[in-house]
Amino acid sequence: STTPLSVLEFARLVQDVIPAGVFNVITGSGSKSGQYMLDHPGFRKLAFTGSTEVGRNVALAAAQKLIPATLELGGKSANIFFEDCDWEMAMDGLQMGILFNQGQVCCAGSRVFVQESIYDRFVEEAVKRFNKVKVGLPWKEETQMGSQIDRRQMEKILKYVEIGKEEGAKVLCGGVQAKEGELEKGCFLRPTLLGDVTNDMRVAQEEIFGPVACIIKFKTEEEVLAMANDSAYGLGGAVWTRDINRALRVARGVETGRMWVNTYNAIPEGAPFGGCKASGIGRETHKVILEHYTQMKNIMINMAEAPTGFYPA
């Protein structure tokens, strides 16, 4: 409802390629046009990408009609850094995980777990790099991070920063609106890192959906696996290490739909993407999605030339 232009442009581009009626775009608020679609009796399949709260309503609407629904919902993904990680790759992955698209990504690496032995150095370097990120207008070549989608979302993010401070977290950098010059009237935020975070804090458990990362210290592989899985969500995540055996153990151990190893936010075509737990149902960007849009049918032909004999004449 707040980003109609891109899909309308896509519709314009494909209108001469696919038959009329195959692809339709309905704009409007989710509470009105979206709810109308949920209530309409003509749909035989529902799909939704968005918040877990709205996703539950979509699932209920599908259940009432006895039709399938695929849901790609919220996340609070774990970005895990072990002491043997490649330093430059790790710093790049930290920023890509939480600053890409201004943090407005369902699989954003918003819980940053850092091994105790490198924690202080990691935090110091991360703060330096976050403070160097160029926040600006999206059409400028030098801009690295643009604005939040609207003022309501910006205010929600800033409220979570305050919640974190009340819980005992420390704002290491950012946490404020960027208002310099031409940014003054926009919804621009400074890249934000929260330190002294524990995994039970609201800022570590609830989806903020913005450029805010919570840094959490851990000692052992077993400890970080337990914390990573102590979440209602399970959409994305990453592990940074030079030890392939550890990488595979952690990747397998985290209950999530996708785990990256030494990268983040790589979403290639052909690789299934979707969530576990409150992060959704079904997988996209892979041929398995076709199973959600089709129904298997069985036609059985009797090849026998005699009756069953169960009911003799």
Q: Which residues are covered by each model-predicted region?
A:
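Conserved C-terminal structural/oligomerization subdomain of aldehyde/semialdehyde dehydrogenase
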Residues: 80, 134, 161, 167, ...
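Conserved small-residue-rich beta-alpha loop and adjacent elements
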Residues: 1-21, 44, 66
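Short alpha-helical
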Residues: 2-5, 31-32, 53-54, 245-246, ...
